[in-house]
């Protein structure tokens, strides 16, 4: 049995992984899905000062207080920023890292610095016009998301503090010692932001590379297929 811990994506929260809990349990695994400060059921704690380090600390404290060790840490989308920071600071608790259609930062990167210029301009326009100058409005869900999943997800996706995307990550290099896997979801949306990280992972030593015939949120759209893939990674 393996314990998986999720660093979720932007605007999301632990709720988004609801379909995955019984599937991972049926495969003999434990899935832990914390929610970052200021999002989801913790959205009442939102304020302009929340940054990337806040979210990294959220996950670090779950590992510490639950005394979780030998975990597989999953970073989905924005959660790749968080998972990288967590693994670098708590490498002794992590067995391996899985990036699920996620950002893979190097020291000094921020999510905004890794975002193409046209996307970055659109994000900042949304912050100014809809987010009171400090919150990022949610992107639309992928077009292949089922109607019932759109209805379930949309009211739960809340705006995210801008500093979580602005703050550069600080890394000491410990994360580079861990086994890492990249799962690229090949039904990409406009811009295909994650192709750059998938291409890097495919050729770098120390990485395993996988593709899913899925759009950006396979934990919602194809949860069984994702559960099988994660089980295979755990056993490999």
Language model features by range: what are they?
Residues 2-43:
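Conserved HGGG/HGGXW glycine-rich cap/lid loop of the alpha/beta-hydrolase fold
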Residues 182-184:
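Short beta-strand/loop motif that positions the catalytic acidic residue
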Residues 75, 79, 83:
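Gly/Ala-rich beta-loop-alpha elbow adjacent to hydrolase catalytic centers
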Residues 30, 36-71, 88-89, 113-116:
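Active-site loop/oxyanion-hole signature of alpha/beta-hydrolase fold enzymes
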Residues 155-174:
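Active-site nucleophile elbow and catalytic-triad environment of alpha/beta-hydrolase enzymes
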Residues 35, 72, 95-98:
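Residue in the alpha/beta-hydrolase core beta-strand immediately N-terminal to the catalytic nucleophile
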Residues 186-213, 217-220, 232-233:
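Conserved loop-alpha-helix segment in the C-terminal half of the alpha/beta-hydrolase fold
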């Amino acid at each position: 049995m393996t314990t998986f811990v999720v660093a979720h994506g932007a605007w999301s929260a632990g709720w988004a992984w609801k379909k995955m809990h019984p599937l991972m349990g049926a495969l003999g695994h434990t899935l832990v899905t914390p929610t970052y400060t200021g999002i989801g059921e913790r959205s009442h704690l939102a304020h302009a000062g929340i940054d990337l380090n806040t979210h990294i600390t959220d996950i670090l404290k779950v590992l510490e207080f639950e005394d979780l060790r030998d975990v597989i840490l999953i970073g989905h989308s924005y959660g790749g920023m968080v998972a990288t920071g967590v693994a670098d600071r708590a490498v002794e608790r992590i067995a391996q890292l899985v990036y699920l259609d996620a950002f893979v930062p190097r020291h000094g990167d921020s999510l905004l610095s890794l975002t193409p210029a046209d996307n970055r301009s659109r994000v900042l326009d949304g912050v100014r016009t809809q987010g009171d100058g400090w919150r990022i409005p949610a992107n639309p869900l992928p077009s292949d998301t089922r109607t019932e999943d759109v209805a379930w997800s949309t009211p739960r996706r809340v705006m995210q503090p801008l500093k979580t995307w602005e703050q550069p990550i600080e890394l000491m290099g410990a994360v580079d010692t861990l086994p890492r896997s990249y799962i690229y979801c090949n039904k990409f949306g406009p811009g295909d932001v994650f192709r750059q990280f998938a291409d890097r992972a495919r050729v770098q030593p120390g990485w395993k590379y996988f593709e899913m015939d899925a759009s950006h949120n396979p934990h919602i759209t194809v949860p069984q297929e994702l559960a099988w893939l994660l089980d295979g990674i755990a056993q490999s």
